Protein backbone atom coordinates (compact mmCIF):
# COMPACT_ATOMS: atom_id res chain seq x y z
CA UNK A 1 0.00 0.00 0.00
CA UNK A 2 1.46 3.36 -1.08
CA UNK A 3 1.73 5.86 1.76
CA UNK A 4 0.89 9.54 1.38
CA UNK A 5 3.89 11.81 0.92
CA UNK A 6 6.21 9.12 -0.40
CA UNK A 7 7.57 8.35 -3.87
CA UNK A 8 7.34 5.08 -5.77
CA UNK A 9 8.45 3.35 -8.91
CA UNK A 10 5.24 2.01 -10.43
CA UNK A 11 3.68 0.46 -13.50
CA UNK A 12 0.79 2.34 -15.11
CA UNK A 13 -2.61 0.86 -14.31
CA UNK A 14 -6.23 1.89 -13.88
CA UNK A 15 -7.61 3.02 -11.55
CA UNK A 16 -4.37 3.10 -9.53
CA UNK A 17 -0.71 2.61 -10.48
CA UNK A 18 0.88 -0.62 -9.25
CA UNK A 19 3.74 -0.21 -6.78
CA UNK A 20 7.07 -1.85 -7.65
CA UNK A 21 9.36 -0.16 -5.13
CA UNK A 22 9.53 2.81 -2.83
CA UNK A 23 12.17 5.33 -3.89
CA UNK A 24 13.81 8.31 -2.20
CA UNK A 25 12.98 11.90 -3.09
CA UNK A 26 16.40 12.20 -4.75
CA UNK A 27 15.79 9.08 -6.85
CA UNK A 28 12.38 10.46 -7.79
CA UNK A 29 13.90 13.83 -8.80
CA UNK A 30 16.73 12.14 -10.72
CA UNK A 31 14.27 10.03 -12.72
CA UNK A 32 12.24 13.12 -13.61
CA UNK A 33 15.44 14.93 -14.61
CA UNK A 34 16.49 11.99 -16.79
CA UNK A 35 13.03 12.02 -18.38
CA UNK A 36 13.42 15.66 -19.41
CA UNK A 37 16.79 14.89 -21.01
CA UNK A 38 15.50 11.85 -22.87
CA UNK A 39 12.39 13.67 -24.09
CA UNK A 40 14.64 16.41 -25.49
CA UNK A 41 15.78 13.81 -28.01
CA UNK A 42 12.35 14.15 -29.68
CA UNK A 43 13.25 17.69 -30.76
CA UNK A 44 16.40 16.53 -32.53
CA UNK A 45 14.59 13.57 -34.03
CA UNK A 46 12.00 15.96 -35.45
CA UNK A 47 14.70 18.17 -36.92
CA UNK A 48 16.20 15.16 -38.68
CA UNK A 49 12.73 14.27 -39.92
CA UNK A 50 12.33 17.84 -41.23
CA UNK A 51 15.63 17.55 -43.13
CA UNK A 52 14.55 14.21 -44.61
CA UNK A 53 11.18 15.69 -45.62
CA UNK A 54 13.02 18.41 -47.55
CA UNK A 55 15.13 15.76 -49.30
CA UNK A 56 11.99 13.81 -50.17
CA UNK A 57 10.22 16.95 -51.38
CA UNK A 58 13.02 17.64 -53.87
CA UNK A 59 12.95 14.17 -55.38
CA UNK A 60 9.15 13.97 -55.25
CA UNK A 61 9.21 17.14 -57.36
CA UNK A 62 11.60 15.45 -59.78
CA UNK A 63 9.21 12.53 -60.19
CA UNK A 64 6.22 14.85 -60.53
CA UNK A 65 7.72 17.05 -63.24
CA UNK A 66 9.21 14.09 -65.08
CA UNK A 67 5.71 12.59 -65.21
CA UNK A 68 4.25 15.90 -66.41
CA UNK A 69 6.90 16.16 -69.11
CA UNK A 70 6.12 12.64 -70.30
CA UNK A 71 2.39 13.44 -70.33
CA UNK A 72 3.03 16.56 -72.42
CA UNK A 73 3.82 14.33 -75.41
CA UNK A 74 0.34 12.78 -75.17
CA UNK A 75 -1.81 15.70 -74.05
CA UNK A 76 -1.70 19.46 -73.53
CA UNK A 77 -0.51 20.70 -70.14
CA UNK A 78 -2.38 23.97 -69.71
CA UNK A 79 0.07 25.85 -67.52
CA UNK A 80 3.77 26.65 -67.51
CA UNK A 81 4.91 23.64 -65.49
CA UNK A 82 8.53 24.19 -66.47
CA UNK A 83 8.57 27.62 -64.85
CA UNK A 84 6.86 26.16 -61.79
CA UNK A 85 9.47 23.39 -61.69
CA UNK A 86 12.30 25.93 -61.69
CA UNK A 87 10.88 27.69 -58.62
CA UNK A 88 9.93 24.44 -56.87
CA UNK A 89 13.36 22.82 -57.23
CA UNK A 90 15.08 25.92 -55.88
CA UNK A 91 12.59 26.17 -53.03
CA UNK A 92 13.14 22.54 -52.00
CA UNK A 93 16.92 22.81 -52.25
CA UNK A 94 17.08 26.03 -50.23
CA UNK A 95 14.78 24.53 -47.58
CA UNK A 96 17.00 21.45 -47.35
CA UNK A 97 20.16 23.49 -46.94
CA UNK A 98 18.57 25.86 -44.41
CA UNK A 99 17.18 22.99 -42.34
CA UNK A 100 20.43 21.05 -42.06
CA UNK A 101 22.56 24.17 -41.54
CA UNK A 102 20.39 25.39 -38.66
CA UNK A 103 20.35 21.87 -37.21
CA UNK A 104 24.15 21.71 -37.15
CA UNK A 105 24.35 25.17 -35.58
CA UNK A 106 21.77 24.21 -32.95
CA UNK A 107 23.74 21.08 -32.03
CA UNK A 108 26.88 23.17 -31.64
CA UNK A 109 25.08 25.70 -29.42
CA UNK A 110 23.58 22.90 -27.31
CA UNK A 111 26.98 21.33 -26.68
CA UNK A 112 28.23 24.75 -25.52
CA UNK A 113 25.26 25.20 -23.20
CA UNK A 114 25.79 21.77 -21.63
CA UNK A 115 29.56 21.79 -21.17
CA UNK A 116 30.69 25.43 -21.49
CA UNK A 117 32.26 27.17 -24.47
CA UNK A 118 35.85 26.25 -23.51
CA UNK A 119 35.18 22.59 -22.71
CA UNK A 120 36.85 19.57 -24.30
CA UNK A 121 33.45 18.46 -25.58
CA UNK A 122 32.95 21.70 -27.50
CA UNK A 123 36.46 21.39 -28.91
CA UNK A 124 35.76 17.80 -29.96
CA UNK A 125 32.49 18.67 -31.70
CA UNK A 126 33.95 21.76 -33.41
CA UNK A 127 36.90 19.69 -34.57
CA UNK A 128 34.54 17.12 -36.07
CA UNK A 129 32.63 19.82 -37.98
CA UNK A 130 35.87 21.44 -39.14
CA UNK A 131 37.17 18.13 -40.46
CA UNK A 132 33.88 17.56 -42.24
CA UNK A 133 34.09 20.99 -43.86
CA UNK A 134 37.73 20.45 -44.84
CA UNK A 135 37.34 16.94 -46.23
CA UNK A 136 33.93 16.86 -47.92
CA UNK A 137 33.34 19.13 -50.92
CA UNK A 138 29.60 18.46 -50.94
CA UNK A 139 29.26 19.62 -47.33
CA UNK A 140 31.29 22.83 -47.60
CA UNK A 141 29.70 23.63 -50.97
CA UNK A 142 26.16 23.31 -49.61
CA UNK A 143 27.00 25.22 -46.42
CA UNK A 144 28.11 28.19 -48.54
CA UNK A 145 25.35 27.66 -51.10
CA UNK A 146 22.91 28.83 -48.43
CA UNK A 147 24.75 32.18 -48.30
CA UNK A 148 24.69 32.30 -52.10
CA UNK A 149 20.91 31.82 -52.08
CA UNK A 150 20.52 34.65 -49.55
CA UNK A 151 22.85 37.20 -51.15
CA UNK A 152 23.02 36.36 -54.85
CA UNK A 153 20.16 34.29 -56.23
CA UNK A 154 18.75 30.86 -56.90
CA UNK A 155 21.42 28.11 -56.74
CA UNK A 156 19.79 26.12 -59.56
CA UNK A 157 20.24 28.11 -62.75
CA UNK A 158 18.64 25.80 -65.28
CA UNK A 159 16.13 22.95 -65.24
CA UNK A 160 16.62 20.75 -68.28
CA UNK A 161 13.84 18.49 -69.58
CA UNK A 162 15.16 15.72 -71.82
CA UNK A 163 13.62 12.92 -73.86
CA UNK A 164 15.79 10.04 -75.05
CA UNK A 165 14.62 7.68 -77.78
CA UNK A 166 16.20 4.26 -78.14
CA UNK A 167 14.67 3.07 -81.40
CA UNK A 168 13.78 4.66 -84.76
CA UNK A 169 10.05 4.24 -84.14
CA UNK A 170 10.29 6.38 -81.03
CA UNK A 171 8.27 3.91 -78.97
CA UNK A 172 10.93 3.25 -76.33
CA UNK A 173 11.61 6.56 -74.58
CA UNK A 174 13.19 7.73 -71.37
CA UNK A 175 12.38 11.08 -69.78
CA UNK A 176 14.63 13.00 -67.43
CA UNK A 177 14.60 16.26 -65.49
CA UNK A 178 17.97 17.65 -64.37
CA UNK A 179 18.80 20.60 -62.14
CA UNK A 180 21.95 22.42 -63.18
CA UNK A 181 23.94 25.10 -61.45
CA UNK A 182 25.90 27.64 -63.44
CA UNK A 183 29.57 26.94 -62.84
CA UNK A 184 30.46 30.39 -64.18
CA UNK A 185 28.06 32.26 -61.89
CA UNK A 186 28.84 30.16 -58.83
CA UNK A 187 32.61 30.22 -59.27
CA UNK A 188 32.63 34.00 -59.80
CA UNK A 189 30.71 34.71 -56.58
CA UNK A 190 32.59 35.97 -53.54
CA UNK A 191 30.14 33.99 -51.43
CA UNK A 192 32.57 31.09 -51.85
CA UNK A 193 36.22 31.19 -50.84
CA UNK A 194 38.92 30.66 -53.45
CA UNK A 195 39.20 26.96 -52.65
CA UNK A 196 35.50 26.26 -53.24
CA UNK A 197 35.43 28.45 -56.36
CA UNK A 198 38.29 26.40 -57.78
CA UNK A 199 36.52 23.16 -56.89
CA UNK A 200 33.33 24.33 -58.61
CA UNK A 201 35.31 25.05 -61.77
CA UNK A 202 36.76 21.53 -61.66
CA UNK A 203 33.40 19.79 -61.32
CA UNK A 204 32.26 17.76 -64.30
CA UNK A 205 29.84 19.24 -66.80
CA UNK A 206 26.90 19.32 -66.63
CA UNK A 207 26.93 20.46 -63.01
CA UNK A 208 23.80 18.82 -61.54
CA UNK A 209 23.57 20.13 -57.98
CA UNK A 210 21.02 17.50 -56.93
CA UNK A 211 23.67 14.76 -57.13
CA UNK A 212 25.11 15.98 -53.81
CA UNK A 213 21.88 15.95 -51.80
CA UNK A 214 21.93 12.34 -50.59
CA UNK A 215 25.62 12.52 -49.68
CA UNK A 216 25.06 15.64 -47.58
CA UNK A 217 22.03 14.06 -45.90
CA UNK A 218 24.14 11.05 -44.88
CA UNK A 219 26.79 13.41 -43.49
CA UNK A 220 24.16 15.18 -41.38
CA UNK A 221 23.05 11.85 -39.92
CA UNK A 222 26.69 11.32 -38.91
CA UNK A 223 26.75 14.80 -37.32
CA UNK A 224 23.67 13.81 -35.32
CA UNK A 225 25.36 10.62 -34.10
CA UNK A 226 28.47 12.56 -33.16
CA UNK A 227 26.35 15.08 -31.27
CA UNK A 228 24.67 12.29 -29.29
CA UNK A 229 28.07 10.76 -28.54
CA UNK A 230 29.64 14.03 -27.37
CA UNK A 231 26.56 14.91 -25.30
CA UNK A 232 26.26 11.37 -23.97
CA UNK A 233 25.61 12.46 -20.39
CA UNK A 234 22.52 14.36 -21.59
CA UNK A 235 21.05 11.59 -23.74
CA UNK A 236 22.87 8.25 -23.75
CA UNK A 237 23.55 7.91 -20.03
CA UNK A 238 19.96 8.74 -18.97
CA UNK A 239 18.65 6.43 -21.70
CA UNK A 240 20.85 3.58 -20.46
CA UNK A 241 19.65 4.14 -16.91
CA UNK A 242 16.04 3.77 -18.03
CA UNK A 243 16.83 0.62 -20.01
CA UNK A 244 18.62 -0.89 -17.00
CA UNK A 245 15.67 -0.02 -14.76
CA UNK A 246 13.30 -1.66 -17.24
CA UNK A 247 15.43 -4.82 -17.30
CA UNK A 248 15.73 -5.00 -13.50
CA UNK A 249 11.96 -4.90 -13.06
CA UNK A 250 11.21 -6.78 -16.30
CA UNK A 251 8.76 -4.06 -17.31
CA UNK A 252 8.40 -2.16 -20.59
CA UNK A 253 6.15 0.46 -18.98
CA UNK A 254 7.38 2.23 -15.87
CA UNK A 255 6.27 5.37 -14.10
CA UNK A 256 7.16 7.36 -11.01
CA UNK A 257 4.36 8.15 -8.61
CA UNK A 258 4.07 10.50 -5.68
CA UNK A 259 1.08 10.23 -3.35
CA UNK A 260 -0.45 13.33 -1.79
CA UNK A 261 -3.36 14.06 0.51
CA UNK A 262 -5.61 16.53 -1.31
CA UNK A 263 -9.07 17.60 -0.09
CA UNK A 264 -9.12 14.83 2.48
CA UNK A 265 -8.23 11.99 0.11
CA UNK A 266 -5.03 10.38 -1.19
CA UNK A 267 -4.30 11.18 -4.83
CA UNK A 268 -1.57 9.55 -6.90
CA UNK A 269 0.36 11.68 -9.39
CA UNK A 270 2.26 9.59 -11.91
CA UNK A 271 4.62 10.39 -14.78
CA UNK A 272 5.42 7.78 -17.40
CA UNK A 273 9.14 7.12 -17.91
CA UNK A 274 10.26 7.19 -21.58
CA UNK A 275 11.56 3.60 -21.84
CA UNK A 276 10.74 3.14 -25.54
CA UNK A 277 12.32 6.48 -26.41
CA UNK A 278 15.43 5.55 -24.42
CA UNK A 279 15.79 2.41 -26.52
CA UNK A 280 15.43 4.48 -29.69
CA UNK A 281 18.24 6.79 -28.56
CA UNK A 282 20.60 3.87 -27.99
CA UNK A 283 19.64 2.38 -31.35
CA UNK A 284 20.60 5.67 -33.05
CA UNK A 285 24.04 5.85 -31.46
Model-based region annotation:
Residues 1-90, 121-285:
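Acidic, Ser/Thr/Gly/Pro-rich intrinsically disordered interaction regions
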Residues 88-134:
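Flexible secondary-structure boundary motifs
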Amino acid sequence: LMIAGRQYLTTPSNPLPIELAEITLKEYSDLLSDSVKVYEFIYYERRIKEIKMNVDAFFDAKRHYTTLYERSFREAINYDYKEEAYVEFNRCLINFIASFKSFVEHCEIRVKSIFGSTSDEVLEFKSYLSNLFDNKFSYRFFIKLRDYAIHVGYPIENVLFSKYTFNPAGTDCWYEVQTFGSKNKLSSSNTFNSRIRGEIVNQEEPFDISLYIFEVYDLIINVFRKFLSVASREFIEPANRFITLSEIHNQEDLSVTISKIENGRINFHSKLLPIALAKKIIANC
